[in-house]
Every structure is written in C-alpha cells, then in structure tokens.
C-alpha cells in the first residue's frame, strides 16, 4: 500500500519576522488576492529591491506584475497614475527617501489631485513605498524624513508603521484603499524581528495607538522614533518617572483621540521626530494639542527633532538624530514646570 503524501505544515498564525519579511508577506497577500495589484520600481524583480522587500515576488507572479523599471522616478509615478486610471492598483517602490523628489511633481500635481479633478469619477489606488529616516549610516538623500512635504498636500494619505505586525497589515490596507497612499518604511526597523499575527488585525489603517502606558508625561512618535521613545520611557521608569508613548502610525489623517486622552491624563506632551522641527508634522501635533487640550496642559508642548540643517555625513548621524537622552532631556524640562 502506498503511503499517503505528508501534508504541508501550515504556517503558524504568529510568526517572528523582521519588517522586510513582513512587508514581503503583505505584498504577496495583496498580489494573490487581486490580479490588478502590480509592483513597479528599480530593481524590484530578480534583485528583490535594495532592501529585498520584493524578493521572490517576480519569480512567483511574473515580470508583468512585478516590473523592473528604468531609473526615472517621475516616469515610474506617472506610469502608476496611468495604470490606476485603467483600473489597476500599482505599488511603487522608491529606493531611498531622497530619490522621491524627481517624482515629486507627479505626486503633488497629478496623483494627489486626479480624483478631485474628475469629481470622483476616477480613483487613484496607488501606493508609493518610501524608506524613511536614518540610523543606517548612509549619506544625504538616503536617510532623510520627508513626511512634511507630503502631509501638506491635500489628497494624499500618509502612513508610517513602526512594527513588523503593523507593516504586514498596513501595506495590505494601503493597497486596498482607493486613495493614493504614501507608505513610509523606517529603515532602522527593517531588520529587528517582531511578532506578526497573520490572522488578526486589531487597528484600522489610520488609527494611532498607545504603546506604553504612563502618568507623568506623554511622548508622541512615529516610524523609527517609536522604539527610541520606548527606550526613553524604560530609562525614565528606572529613575521613577512614568512616561506614556503614543505611536501615531498615520500622519495624514492623524487620529488625535488617543493623543488627547493621553495628554488629558498626563498634562504634558513631548513630540519626537527624526525630521527637522521647522514646519513639520511635530509642529502640527503640537498646535492641535495646544488648541484642543490647552486646559489640560501643565507645561508647554515641547519637541525633539532633527536639526534644521542638511543631513550630515554618516559619521555625524548620531549627533543629528534624536536619541533617548535627548528625549529625556526635554521630558525633564517639561516636568520642571
């Protein structure tokens, strides 16, 4: 009697994955679920992208769905816009954050405005994936945080996961959206592993979340600054201070409800970001909290940010980017009021 073939072991519901693998799995799920989903970008095919986020996808789904493009960001974004008008759901990969600017005109004057221009008769289900932030020891154009440019542009949704679990689910939700989504991926979080629950997604795409409870002050952060803020909270706890940390997750729109609840409890707010502080997402958060929670504040809203200078050479990166010590220094100023 022939032995029955062994059944393949099902993948575990909860897996420990780095963000690059979580994104890869999320993209694969989207490609399987909808034949209209396409991936476009430089070296996204056999190479799998600079960070290997698309590794193996072209061999599985073919070169007509995972498309290697020329080095021409304006052309890549423009092609994605045309594909969206024909009913496709293109996902564009930008190799590094500074490389998005050659495509900036297409994003801000066409992609963001197309649906409004046609009174809603045309939708723009385009996702633009952009590596975000620093902590990788690179040079200018490779580790900047350009979210404020896009957050100021009406018509774009902007998200920035900080964990592999969020990355897995948020990339799928972004692809399912009928609006254009700028999807920032913190490079400092690409490789550390985290638990990914592939069956349960507890939060909608644009929900912010309290990731650590506290009573003395609130820290708001996003993307690669979330683990830095959590580290600051751990150090503070050892010194007898209780800090609450809120992960925004979405930068446009911003879900302020958890932020305001937290500030009403703690009476103090510190906003931490990698980008320069001037005219930034952090500026907006500070302004809105000042408007909506003024009578709950025991101290001015304070910010920790990258300096208002061009990004420095790699060896000076650690001096430029906020770390736990800089966050705690500002927290101490807040608590001193």
From Swiss-Prot:
It catalyses: N(6)-[(R)-lipoyl]-L-lysyl-[protein] + pyruvate + H(+) = N(6)-[(R)-S(8)-acetyldihydrolipoyl]-L-lysyl-[protein] + CO2. Its cofactor is thiamine diphosphate. Keywords: Oxidoreductase, Pyruvate, Thiamine pyrophosphate. It comes from the Bacteria. Its EC number is 1.2.4.1. Thiamine diphosphate binds at residue 73. Pfam families: Transket_pyr, Transketolase_C. InterPro entries: THDP-binding, Transketo_C/PFOR_II, Transketolase-like_Pyr-bd, Transketolase_C. The pyruvate dehydrogenase complex catalyzes the overall conversion of pyruvate to acetyl-CoA and CO(2). It contains multiple copies of three enzymatic components: pyruvate dehydrogenase (E1), dihydrolipoamide acetyltransferase (E2) and lipoamide dehydrogenase (E3). Heterodimer of an alpha and a beta chain. This is Pyruvate dehydrogenase E1 component subunit beta. It comes from Leifsonia xyli subsp. xyli (strain CTCB07).
């Amino acid at each position: 009697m022939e032995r029955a073939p062994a059944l393949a072991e099902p993948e575990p519901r909860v897996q420990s994955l780095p963000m690059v693998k979580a994104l890869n799995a999320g993209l694969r799920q989207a490609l399987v679920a909808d034949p209209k989903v396409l991936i476009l970008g430089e070296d996204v095919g056999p190479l799998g992208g600079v960070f290997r986020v698309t590794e193996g996808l072209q061999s599985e789904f073919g070169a007509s769905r995972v498309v290697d493009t020329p080095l021409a960001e304006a052309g890549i974004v423009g092609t994605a816009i045309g594909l969206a008008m024909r009913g496709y759901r293109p996902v564009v990969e930008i190799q590094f954050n500074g490389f998005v600017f050659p495509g900036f005109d297409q994003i801000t004057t066409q992609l963001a405005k197309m649906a409004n221009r046609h009174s809603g008769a045309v939708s723009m289900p385009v996702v633009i994936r952009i590596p975000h932030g620093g902590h990788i020891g690179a040079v200018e154009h490779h580790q900047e945080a350009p979210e404020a440019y896009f957050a100021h542009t009406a018509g774009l949704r902007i998200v920035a996961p900080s964990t592999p679990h969020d990355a897995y689910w948020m990339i799928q939700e972004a692809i399912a959206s009928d609006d254009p989504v700028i999807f920032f991926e913190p490079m400092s979080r690409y490789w550390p592993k985290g638990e990914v629950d592939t069956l349960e997604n507890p939060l909608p795409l644009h929900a912010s979340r309290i990731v650590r409870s506290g009573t003395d002050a609130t820290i708001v952060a996003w993307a690669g600054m979330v683990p830095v803020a959590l580290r600051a909270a751990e150090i503070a706890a050892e010194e007898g201070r209780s800090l609450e940390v809120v992960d925004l997750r979405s930068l446009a729109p911003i879900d302020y409800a958890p932020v305001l609840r937290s500030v009403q409890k703690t009476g103090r707010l510190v906003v931490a970001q990698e980008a320069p502080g001037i005219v930034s997402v952090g500026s907006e958060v500070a302004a809105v909290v000042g408007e909506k929670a003024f009578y709950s504040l025991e101290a001015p809203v304070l910010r920790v940010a990258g300096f208002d200078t061009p990004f420095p050479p790699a060896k000076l990166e650690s001096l430029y980017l906020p770390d736990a010590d800089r966050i705690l220094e500002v927290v101490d100023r807040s608590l001193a009021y």
